[in-house]
Each structure stands twice: as structure tokens, then as C-alpha cells.
């Protein structure tokens, strides 16, 4: 199978992998001579060939034997290993962002500003103002998931967005930004790019998502559809003025408690089995209870995470714990799983913890991370045995 593609545009973000193998794929970009062109092919060792003729500069790549895209679950969000072409005729990434910044500034509205002041008029502090505005937008506006490129990077007047109760991700981000600033919270819109791209060579098409940075009581908060701080440095965050933003990586923190009672009626033949319930958040919500034993591509977790669940078990009178109370620890270079069982008077305290401090794993590392996840999700590891 052969595929040839010629793109004449000023802003390209194209993945060059299909669901079936490609024998040969030729990609070419043509621009008038003298036009600035920044381009890069990622996920492939193929080098660019540049030619000029009749006042036209052409840059092309010929890729051969591209494998079919993987159907494995939990692939990297940025697909770093897939052939990926990025090109732009903007003078720089900063210049591209400046065009977007200009359009956002033209979309400011009076009604949305006064409405933000009305909503937060009785708020006691800055954090409360942020929560009120964020919750209003989340609960009362719908997001139309239309890529920015398909709208021509246009932004409706923000007052129109507020009145219509819907908007594109770009419009929703700008509405949040405008309302926060109107409430006295210094804020700005940020662009988020895949971390492996050279953002200075990117146009607007390579933007993965948008976020809003709000300075609350002197500390920066990042408001986005998914937490930016849990990605482990896999993304690059840039302000619309072109300044790179360094975001401290912090794992998701989950700490929950459960109470479990065991009655004598549950015993059979002198023994009772107690299965501690899984929680509905964290790793148990990721759908990883049945991972393949082997993997040929990168494996990516939804986020870094630290999770702790404490169970207080109250057995019936006369029941004795038969499960070993020895601490269990399974440790790997990037995380660990622990379990402690401690009798406390008439109750038994069970504490399970898991830490995953890395988000992306090679096929060689996959077995280790799979063993930690399996240790956590396997219901057999949440069983206590009692005798009566």
C-alpha cells in the first residue's frame, strides 16, 4: 500500500500512522521561497529532503513500512512513538500564540465581568471566588468538543458564550479567564503541548488542550479539564505570551476510610471470610484489573498517584483473626504496594497503600508496574480469614 500526501498550509499537525500497515508514504510541504518554515518529523528516523524549483521550496519525507497503529489499551496520550509531522509558517511559536492571544482579547465582554462580580460579591476569600466561578461554568455551561482548527481559531464574544450556555474549549477557557480577572483573581490562558514537541517550531494546530492559571493568595493554581500537575512532565505548558511555565509535578492523593462488620452468621464450618470492599476512586476506577501479561508498546498511567485506604473491621464476639499480621511490602524502583494489619482492641485496622511515581513505562518495565497494579486490584489481597 502506498500513500502520498501534499500539504499546503501554514499550520500542520498530522499523525502518519493508520489502523493498517502502510508500505510507503510520501509527505511533502510546499511553500514559496523566502517563506519561513519550521517543521519536524517525530517518532521516525527519516530525514527531510529539501528541494527548490520555480520559486517553490519543497520539503518531503518518504516513510516506508509503517506498522499499523497499536490497539493496546493505555497507550501514551501524546503517542510519542508514532510518526508525527508538525510544521508551521509562523515566524515562531511565540508569534503563533500571539495571534490567538489577540483574538481572545478581542472577545472580552462587559456582561460576563459584571456577572462574575455579582456571583462573588459575598465571597469571603479568593479561593471561594475561584470555586464559585469554576463551579458555575462547570455546572451551567456545556462544552462543544470542536477542535480549534475546525473553527478557524475564532472566538465568539464571551457575553454570547455566557448567555448561550455553551462554548468550545477555547471559549470556555477564555470565559473562565475573564470572569476570574473580573473577580480580582489574576488569571491567564495557557496552551498545553505534547512534551516531546519543539514548541518554538509549532503553530496553533499542535496545541493539545488549554488551561487557565489563576493566582490565588499568592499561589498559582491550574484549572483545566484534567489536572496538569499529575502528568509527570509529559506535557509542555506555555503562556500566550510565549513564556514556558514550569509546573511542579504532584501525584493524585487519595485517602479514604471504610468500616466493615462481620457477623457470626457469615461463618461456615467454623470459619468466616471477610472481603474488604474496593473504593470507587483511584486505581480501582482505571479499569486495569485484567492487564495483558506482555506488551509491545509504551504503557501510560492516567496519572501519578498515592492512594491509602484504611479499613476498620469489627468481627463478631469470639472470632479470631487467622490471616497473618506481618506487614507486606512489594517495592519497585518507581513505586510500592503495602499492607498492614493491626489488632486494636475489639477491632482490626487494615491499611493498604500504593504509590506510583512514574507515569510512562517501556515494554521492559511493564511487567514490574503490572505486578504492582495487580497486587492492588486483585480481590484476593483484600481477604481476611477468621475462625469462630
Task: Describe the predicted segments one by one.
Residues 1-4, 8-388:
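A sensor for short, sequence-defined functional sites
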Amino acid at each position: 500500500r502506498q500513500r502520498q500526501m501534499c500539504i499546503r498550509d501554514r499550520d500542520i499537525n498530522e499523525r502518519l500512522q493508520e489502523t493498517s500497515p502502510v508500505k510507503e508514504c510520501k509527505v511533502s510541504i510546499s511553500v514559496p521561497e523566502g517563506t519561513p518554515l519550521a517543521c519536524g518529523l517525530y517518532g521516525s528516523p527519516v530525514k527531510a529532503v529539501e528541494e527548490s524549483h520555480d520559486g517553490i521550496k519543497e520539503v518531503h519525507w518518504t516513510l516506508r513500512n509503517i506498522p499499523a497503529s497499536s490497539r493496546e489499551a493505555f497507550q501514551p496520550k501524546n503517542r510519542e512513538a508514532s510518526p508525527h509531522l508538525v510544521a508551521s509558517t509562523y515566524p515562531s511559536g511565540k508569534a503563533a500564540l500571539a495571534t490567538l492571544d489577540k483574538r481572545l482579547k478581542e472577545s472580552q465582554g462587559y456582561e460576563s465581568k459584571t456577572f462574575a462580580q455579582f456571583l462573588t460579591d459575598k465571597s469571603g476569600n479568593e479561593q471561594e471566588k475561584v470555586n464559585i466561578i469554576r463551579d458555575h461554568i462547570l455546572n451551567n455551561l456545556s462544552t462543544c468538543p470542536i477542535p480549534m482548527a475546525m473553527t478557524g481559531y475564532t472566538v465568539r464574544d464571551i457575553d454570547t458564550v455566557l448567555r448561550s450556555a455553551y462554548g468550545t474549549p477555547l471559549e470556555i477557557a477564555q470565559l473562565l479567564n475573564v470572569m476570574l480577572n473580573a473577580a480580582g483573581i489574576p488569571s491567564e490562558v495557557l496552551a498545553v503541548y505534547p512534551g516531546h514537541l519543539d514548541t518554538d517550531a509549532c503553530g496553533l494546530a499542535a496545541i493539545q488542550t488549554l488551561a487557565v492559571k489563576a493566582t490565588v493568595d499568592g499561589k498559582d493554581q491550574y484549572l483545566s479539564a484534567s489536572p496538569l500537575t499529575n502528568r509527570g512532565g509529559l506535557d509542555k505548558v506555555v503562556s500566550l505570551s510565549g513564556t514556558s511555565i514550569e509546573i511542579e509535578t504532584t501525584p493524585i492523593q487519595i485517602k479514604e476510610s471504610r468500616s466493615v462488620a462481620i457477623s457470626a452468621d457469615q461463618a461456615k464450618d467454623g470459619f468466616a471470610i471477610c472481603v474488604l470492599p474496593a473504593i470507587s476512586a483511584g486505581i480501582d476506577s482505571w479499569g486495569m484489573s485484567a492487564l495483558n501479561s506482555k506488551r509491545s508498546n509504551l504503557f501510560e498511567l492516567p496519572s501519578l498517584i498515592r492512594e491509602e485506604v484504611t479499613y476498620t473491621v469489627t468481627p463478631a464476639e469470639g472470632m479470631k483473626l487467622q490471616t497473618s499480621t506481618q506487614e507486606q511490602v512489594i517495592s519497585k524502583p518507581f513505586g510500592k504496594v503495602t499492607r498492614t494489619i493491626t489488632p486494636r482492641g475489639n477491632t482490626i485496622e487494615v491499611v493498604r497503600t500504593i504509590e506510583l511515581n512514574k507515569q510512562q513505562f517501556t515494554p521492559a518495565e511493564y511487567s514490574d508496574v503490572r505486578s504492582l497494579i495487580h497486587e492492588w486490584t486483585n480481590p484476593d489481597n483484600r481477604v481476611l480469614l477468621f475462625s469462630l
